[in-house]
């Protein structure tokens, strides 16, 4: 048997978007892209909840709690970490990426990583809706595919 992700029958899905308030001008664009993508694939606006957290490092903690509640079919994580002149950038991106990875492996709720990690503000702007598309929209589609795969493999 071959199992392949499909973007079908998503109408009754409940989605959480966990978003960092830091660099909110970029993150708001990512959220818009994610919302539009989810709605284009049948998710009603009333089934999309946005949970704002102070910064990117708080995303994994809140995503874990949301997954534990088991109210949502999937979780999108969004943020923008832009490199500065200190090593803090590396600490933040490693903490966020590792945290989300651990949570996604330890829960039964699909979670996708949509935290931009860029060297410049311009790169973040390009990836949040300018030249390079909108990564929020892309990860939202990935989430819908994961939800579908999870549903298919329940019967294995």
Swiss-Prot record:
Gene Ontology annotations for the cellular component aspect, listed alphabetically: cytosol; riboflavin synthase complex
Entry's Gene Ontology BP terms: riboflavin biosynthetic process
Gene: ribH
Superkingdom of origin organism: Bacteria
A Pfam family this chain is assigned to: DMRL_synthase
Function: Catalyzes the formation of 6,7-dimethyl-8-ribityllumazine by condensation of 5-amino-6-(D-ribitylamino)uracil with 3,4-dihydroxy-2-butanone 4-phosphate. This is the penultimate step in the biosynthesis of riboflavin.
Alphabetized GO MF terms: 6,7-dimethyl-8-ribityllumazine synthase activity
EC category name: transferase
NCBIfam families in the record: lumazine-synth
E.C. numbers: 2.5.1.78
Signal peptide boundaries: none
Pathway: Cofactor biosynthesis; riboflavin biosynthesis; riboflavin from 2-hydroxy-3-oxobutyl phosphate and 5-amino-6-(D-ribitylamino)uracil: step 1/2
Reactions this protein catalyses: (2S)-2-hydroxy-3-oxobutyl phosphate + 5-amino-6-(D-ribitylamino)uracil = 6,7-dimethyl-8-(1-D-ribityl)lumazine + phosphate + 2 H2O + H(+)
Annotated family: Belongs to the DMRL synthase family.
UniProt-annotated binding residues for 5-amino-6-(D-ribitylamino)uracil: 22, 56-58, 80-82, 113
Catalytic residue positions: 88
Protein name: 6,7-dimethyl-8-ribityllumazine synthase
Listed SUPFAM superfamilies: Lumazine synthase
Assigned keywords, A-Z: Riboflavin biosynthesis, Transferase
InterPro entries membership: LS, LS/RS, LS/RS_sf
List of residues binding (2S)-2-hydroxy-3-oxobutyl phosphate: 85-86, 127
Family annotation (HAMAP family): Lumazine_synth (MF_00178)
């Amino acid at each position: 048997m071959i199992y392949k992700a499909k973007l079908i029958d998503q109408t009754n899905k409940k989605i959480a978007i966990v978003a960092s308030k830091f660099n909110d001008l970029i993150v708001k664009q990512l959220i818009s892209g994610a919302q539009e993508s989810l709605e284009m694939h049948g998710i009603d606006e009333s089934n999309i909840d946005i949970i704002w957290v102070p910064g990117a490092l708080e995303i994994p903690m809140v995503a874990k709690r949301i997954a534990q509640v088991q109210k949502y079919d999937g979780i999108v994580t969004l943020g923008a970490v832009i490199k500065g002149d200190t090593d803090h950038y590396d600490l933040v991106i490693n903490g966020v990426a590792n945290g989300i990875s651990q949570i996604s492996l330890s829960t039964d709720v699909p979670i996708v990583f949509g935290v931009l990690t860029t060297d410049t503000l311009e790169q973040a702007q390009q990836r949040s809706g300018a030249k390079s598309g909108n990564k929020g929209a892309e990860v939202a589609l990935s989430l819908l595919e994961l939800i579908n795969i999870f549903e298919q493999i329940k019967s294995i």
